[in-house]
Amino acid sequence: RYAAQRVVNRVGVGAGIAFGRAALGGGLLAFDDHPGQLYRLYHAVNVGWAPWRLNPGWWAGYAELQYYPPGAAWLGAAIHQASMGAVGVPAAYQAVLWIAWVLPGMATFALLTRLLGSGWLALPGAFIALTLSAESRSGVEEGLRWGLVAARLGWGLLPLVALSLVNWVEGSRRAPL
């Protein structure tokens, strides 16, 4: 059973890396909204984590907080600061893109494996969550290619919320809060 689970894990990880390498390439994404997202990360690192803090390049906050929540910039800043600057801001941004890419698939795989009891049964759903676009703001096309990275990260967190509630729903005595 454990050998079969390792095969499932390797198939999933291999597909995620292969597709991600083709989609994200080897360099920094520099089109659509990515330059602005990289700027937001530089802003979080150099000016501070408060996205509404006065900065002449921050566009007064309105559309920024509505369409570009600061979660992706905060994650990149956390990676940069946790490495004590060893991971530069552009590399931290690439790491955020890879996390945003794989998180929906991995989280869905974990949830479905828990619910269905089989990694093989969970694999198709995880592939759909990993590669789905269908004009979703958090899909591969808009979430990664266009640069709506925080939306993609949010999409990846949803299955983790459900996974955290499974034991409670199945009759545990209290909510996991």
Functional labels for PLM-detected ranges:
Residues 1-3, 59, 175-177:
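Short intrinsically disordered, low-complexity coil segments enriched in acidic
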Residues 6-8, 118-124, 173-176:
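Membrane-interfacial loop-to-transmembrane alpha-helix junctions, especially the N-terminal start
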Residues 6, 10, 46-49, 171:
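Generic structural signal for short, solvent-exposed loop/turn connectors between secondary structure elements
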Residues 16-167:
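Active-site lumenal/periplasmic loops and adjacent helix-entry segments of GT-C-fold
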Residues 1-22:
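Start-transfer (signal-anchor) and selected internal transmembrane alpha helices
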Residues 164-177:
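Short hydrophobic alpha-helices at membrane interfaces in multi-pass membrane enzymes
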